[in-house]
Amino acid sequence: MQDELNLEPAVVWVVDNTQRKTIKDAARFGEIEHVFTDVQYDDPVAHAREVLKDFREGDYLCMIGDPKLSAVCVGVLAQNNPGNEIKLLQFDSRTFQYFPVYLNF
């Protein structure tokens, strides 16, 4: 999908690089980038701030993996984008597809 504002492709920011879940369907929403990898982080909030500084309005956050890391990412995006919509991708286990969910803070 193209970002309506600047024609750059959207990015799907995958919270946790887990091998147990598939993200193949999420790629239809944009280019895949990982916020956290298998490395342990002393300060996950600082790491998420650094990685998500490039999050644009047309991007998505794919909340997969550790719920604490998902909460960190949503908190960082809410702080960095006050009043703007945050697009999340949620997995539907019946259809094996992701669908968008929209949040406004």
Model-derived regions: residue spans:
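Long, low-complexity, Lys/Arg-enriched
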Residues: 1-60, 72-105
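Short, surface-exposed polybasic-aromatic patches that bind anionic ligands, especially phosphate groups
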Residues: 63
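Short beta->alpha connector loops
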Residues: 67-69
